[in-house]
C-alpha cells in the first residue's frame, strides 16, 4: 500500500511533529498543521526540543534544573538533558569546551565524585544512559535541592547528566577551579541510540519493538539511521513499514559499509522534515526520494531508477516537481 498524499506532503515539506519528555519537562501537544512546539520546562528554564543522537556525536546539553543550596551556598546542583535514550555510551563531558574526564572512552554510568576530574576537581557528576526505566535520582542532587527534587526524577528514556559543584576560592592557581558561575556551556560526546537494521530485521519489527534494534556497527550506518527515523512513531516520521522500499535500504546499508560511510550527528526536532532528510542524504551523498508511493534511498553513483507516470502516481510526481522548482 502506497503513501497517502497527505503523508507525501509531510515527507517533503512539513515541519517536524513529535513530542518529548525530559526529567521535569512537560510535553506540548503538536497541532494539526504539523508544527512542533518542543517541550516546556516547568521551572527556571526555556523551551528546548529533545535531541536524537545517532552514531558518535557531540550533543549540546539542555539545562532543566538549577539550584543553590539555601543552607550552604557553596553547593550548586544542576540537571541536564543530553538527548533521547537509550544511548550506547557516554564517552566524555565538556564544560566550556574543557573535558571533564581524563580519557575519552565509554564512561561508567552512575556517580563520579569529586577529584575524578583533573580539570574540574570541585565538580561531581552523575550519568544516565536513558534506560526505559531509570534508577532513582542521585541522592547527592536530592540533598542539595532544598526539597525540590525527589527520587522520582528518574529521567526514564532520557540520557541525562547531573552536576554537583562545590564552589570555593582557589588558592593553588588560576586553573585549579574552573567551575563557579552557574551558566556554562555543557556538551556530551555520546555513542547514540540503537537502530533498525533491515539486513538483520527485514520485517522491521524494531519499528514497534525496541528490543529488536541494534548497535554493533549498524548505529553509525546512514541507511539504518534513516530507516529508524522514518519508521519510529515517537521521535520520527512514524511511517508504516509498507510505505518504505526495504530492499533499497538494504542495498544502501551494504554500500555504506563498503564505502565506510557513517552518519554521526543528532536530529534537532526544531528542524523541518525536509531539513532533517537532507542532512541524512548528505551523509551518504545520495538521494531520499519517492517512487510509486514508496520511500526509497540510493547513492548518487548508482543509476537512477526509472519513474513510470500513471494516473495513480501523477499527483505525487506533480507535488515533487513543484517542490523542486
Kindly label every feature range from the protein language model.
Residues 4, 9-284, 291:
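Polar, S/T/G-rich
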Residues 85-89, 309-325:
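Acidic, small/polar-enriched beta strand-loop surface segments
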Residues 293, 301-314:
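Conserved active-site-proximal loop/helix segments of enzymes involved in bacterial cell-wall
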Amino acid at each position: 500500500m502506497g503513501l497517502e498524499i497527505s503523508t507525501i506532503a509531510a515527507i517533503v515539506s512539513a515541519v517536524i511533529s513529535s513530542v518529548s519528555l525530559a526529567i521535569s519537562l512537560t510535553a506540548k501537544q503538536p497541532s494539526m498543521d504539523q508544527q512542533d512546539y518542543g517541550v516546556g520546562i516547568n521551572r527556571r528554564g526555556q523551551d528546548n526540543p529533545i535531541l536524537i543522537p545517532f552514531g558518535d556525536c557531540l550533543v549540546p546539553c539542555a539545562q532543566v534544573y538549577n539550584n543553590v543550596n539555601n543552607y550552604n551556598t557553596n553547593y550548586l546542583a544542576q540537571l541536564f538533558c543530553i538527548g533521547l535514550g537509550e544511548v550506547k555510551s557516554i564517552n566524555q563531558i565538556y564544560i566550556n569546551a574543557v573535558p571533564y574526564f581524563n580519557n575519552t572512552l565509554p564512561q561508567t554510568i552512575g556517580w563520579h565524585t569529586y577529584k575524578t576530574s583533573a580539570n574540574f576537581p570541585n565538580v561531581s557528576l552523575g550519568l544516565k544512559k536513558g534506560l526505559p526505566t531509570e534508577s532513582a535520582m542521585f541522592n547527592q542532587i536530592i540533598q542539595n535541592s532544598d526539597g525540590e527534587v525527589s527520587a522520582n526524577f528518574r529521567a526514564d528514556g532520557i540520557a541525562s547528566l547531573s552536576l554537583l559543584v562545590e564552589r570555593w576560592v582557589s588558592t593553588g592557581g588560576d586553573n585549579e577551579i574552573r567551575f563557579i558561575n552557574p551558566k556554562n556551556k555543557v556538551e556530551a560526546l555520546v555513542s547514540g541510540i540503537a537502530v533498525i537494521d533491515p539486513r538483520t530485521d527485514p520485517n522491521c519489527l524494531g519499528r514497534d519493538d525496541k528490543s529488536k534494534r541494534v548497535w554493533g556497527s549498524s548505529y553509525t550506518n546512514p541507511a539504518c539511521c534513516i530507516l529508524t527515523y522514518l519508521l519510529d512513531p515517537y521521535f520520527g516520521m512514524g511511517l508504516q513499514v509498507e510505505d518504505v522500499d526495504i530492499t533499497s535500504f538494504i542495498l544502501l546499508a551494504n554500500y555504506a559499509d563498503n564505502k565506510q560511510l557513517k552518519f554521526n550527528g543528532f536530529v534537532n526536532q526544531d528542524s523541518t522534515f525536509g531539513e532533517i532528510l537532507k542532512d541524512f542524504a548528505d551523509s551518504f551523498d545520495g538521494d531520499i526520494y519517492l517512487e510509486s508511493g514508496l520511500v526509497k534511498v540510493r547513492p548518487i553513483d548508482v543509476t537512477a531508477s526509472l519513474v513510470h507516470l500513471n494516473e495513480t502516481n501523477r499527483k505525487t510526481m506533480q507535488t515533487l516537481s513543484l517542490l523542486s522548482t
